UniProtKB/Swiss-Prot annotation:
It holds the Pfam family Kinase-PPPase. InterPro entries: Kinase-pyrophosphorylase (IPR005177), PSRP (IPR026530). Keywords: Kinase, Nucleotide-binding, Serine/threonine-protein kinase, Transferase. Its EC number is 2.7.11.33, 2.7.4.28. Belongs to the pyruvate, phosphate/water dikinase regulatory protein family. PSRP subfamily. It comes from the Bacteria. ADP binds at residues 151-158. It catalyses: [pyruvate, water dikinase] + ADP = [pyruvate, water dikinase]-phosphate + AMP + H(+); [pyruvate, water dikinase]-phosphate + phosphate + H(+) = [pyruvate, water dikinase] + diphosphate. Bifunctional serine/threonine kinase and phosphorylase involved in the regulation of the phosphoenolpyruvate synthase (PEPS) by catalyzing its phosphorylation/dephosphorylation. One of its GO terms (molecular function) is ADP binding. This is Putative phosphoenolpyruvate synthase regulatory protein.
Length: 271
């Protein structure tokens, strides 16, 4: 039976779940995740304790509980459950209060209840920009892009662009490199004024073939030799043009995005 892990939060639980994933990924073990968001009352806290204790009895072992509960009373209630409770706020906020000699706001859901803030608006603008400039569908306002990702079809440009926009508020456009570009031996014309914003994504040809076969099985588009040709040409072009690039083959979207931000010296826009 898989160990049970509860993600308990007074908000969406995204922060707690992200932290839990980072910690649990260090162990060669699968876990059963139970998400318990929006614990914004004493009654809900007691109900959560009942769920945790039921899981302990059913599993025959204590669950693991990651919490980001700001309300002190609710937090103490959950801590009385039959579980290993890992309190993120107490572990990190209290030492920071002492170090900074400041009192934290202790406001529930502060991280994600930000629809009226400039940071939130920046993120929404970035998402809209990335959607409008996906796969080269628009050349308008490319000068406003923070970064323009280039690469062959299905090399990871779209998910990376959207992740940069959603997570960091970065205006990320993406533009495909196609066989016609390789025949000319030049970057697509609309990209010429924006060379300083370009960053390339490549991928292993066989992995690219697998991905394309899911979309167009048996086609020339997905054939290994065609994928090999496109990747070789794309990488050669990026080297000629002095465009920084990386292989997305064995990297997560998070790793790709972080590398791009570091390579182009772009500071995170949202926090």
């Amino acid at each position: 039976m898989l160990p049970t892990v509860f993600i308990v939060s007074d908000g969406t639980g995204i922060t707690a779940e992200t932290f839990a994933h980072s910690i649990l990924s260090q162990f060669d073990q699968k876990f059963r995740l139970v998400r318990v968001p929006f614990i914004d009352s004493i009654e809900k806290a007691y109900d959560t304790v009942r769920k945790i204790n039921d899981a302990a009895q059913h599993d025959g072992r204590r669950p693991i509980v990651f919490t980001t509960l700001v309300d002190g009373e609710s937090n103490e209630i959950v801590k009385r459950s039959n579980a290993l409770v890992l309190d993120m706020f107490q572990r990190f906020v209290e030492p920071l209060e002492q170090e900074l000699q400041l009192k934290s706001s202790h406001a529930m859901g502060r991280v994600h209840q930000n629809a009226d803030t400039e940071e939130y608006k920046t993120r929404i603008e970035a998402i809209n920009f990335s959607l409008a400039h996906d796969d080269g569908q628009s050349n308008r306002n490319l000068a406003d892009a923070d970064v323009i990702l280039i690469g062959v079809s299905r090399s990871g440009k779209t998910p990376t662009s959207l992740y940069l926009a959603m997570q960091y508020g970065v205006k990320a456009a993406n533009y495909p490199l196609i066989p016609e570009d390789f025949e000319r031996g030049k970057l697509p014309t609309p990209l010429h004024p924006h060379r300083d914003k370009l960053f390339g994504l490549s991928i292993d040809p066989m992995r690219l073939s697998e991905i394309r076969n899911e979309r167009r099985p048996g086609s020339k588009y997905a054939a290994p030799e065609n994928c090999r040709y496109e990747i070789n040409e794309a990488e050669a072009m990026m080297r000629r043009e002095g465009v920084k690039w990386l292989s997305s083959t064995h990297k997560s979207i998070e790793e790709i995005a972080t590398t791009i931000l570091q390579e182009i010296k772009l500071e995170r826009q949202s926090y």
